[in-house]
Amino acid sequence: MERDLKEILDTALAAAEPGKTVGRFLSAEGGRVMVGDESFEPERVFVLAVGKASGPMARAAREALGETLSGGLCVIKGGHEEPPQPFETIVAGHPEPDEGSVRAAERAQKLLEGLEEGDLLLVLVSGGASALLADVASDIGLEDLKKLNGALLRSGAEIGEINTVRKHVSTLKGGNLVRRAAPAHVVALLLSDVVGDEPSSIGSGLTAPDPTTLEDVRRVFERYEVAPPQSVTDHLQGAHETPKPGHEAFEKLTNIVVGGSRLTASAAAEKARELGYEPLLLSTYLTGDARHVASLHAAVVKEILESENPLPPPCAVVTGGEATVVVRGEGMGGPNQEFALTLAVELEGIESWAALAVDTDGADGSTDAAGGLVTGETVAAIREGGVDPARALDENDSYNALKAGDALVFTGATGTNVNDLRVVLISGEARR
């Protein structure tokens, strides 16, 4: 089953290759640019690409637009694919913003300031855009932004809640990019890394009206007991609200979601069927603590093995979404590694199953692993490697535990980013 899981992963990642997703929606002929169902005859065409898939997305845009492209800016994570000319490329930090992220925001604002009536701005957004583009308000600064970002990531807040905060301490997020691009027409192609594929959440809503408010930000701080830096508190008290639905800035805006979690999950399910497993695409909306998500999957596996409900083996349970980790210890890991380790512990000694959990960008948390691949024998292998799995969970040290059990998954930078992918294969009845 481990080999089957690796084949399923390869197929799922190929389905979300960013160049393919852009190419399906963008083309040009003569002076006309076609995006989805819309057609434009712009004076000039510029591209702003930001996110962990920005390199291949920009490359695909260059191929589609040809000489129609007037210029562009591409913001990438270090080690990721760079775009061709005429793009200016800036390498920025992720998951923590850095000086490159600040420089990228400055260059993006300069690009926006140069737009005129009759121009078309194509914005290519993928996961990671929020950190890669550090458009922090001038009264906050990078260091306090990094403190805020780190506190939110450690708190266990869901990505949508984190983005709610980011929008209100930024100059481009929360729809402000579109406001600054006026009077040009803005078309955004969005490779979604958020549950539900809502444009106002992708990249912290760079190109969408913001339905969240300053009061929502305060609720996030209270719910997760986050104490923001004083500069953030002062900024929020200044009532810096984002543009809302109905604002005139969005009259010349088109958002198109070109791919997301369902794309990879569906491809994984179909590949599983091809390999002889009846697939159940359970949900692409699973969020929350990785341990709780793992417990749900463990319960489903036990039910299938004991009662053949909701379907009999051989079968595949496929889910997507974005899990989080509440940091309690000082170890290494990420949500998918924590999911995999928790699942292995809960199903220890049970045969006839194998599971894969990965971050589709190839980097789970701040580690070099994409996630984990575990079976009923993984916990025993971890112990043989000298690591106590329960203690590793207490210390949030899933990386080293899975490493000890030879259960880490490495893909390298995949070039895409469409949330988490989890696949559990079940081959037959359990035996202890």
Where are these regions (language model features)?
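Short beta-strand segments
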Residues: 48-50, 73-76, 123-127, 188-194, ...
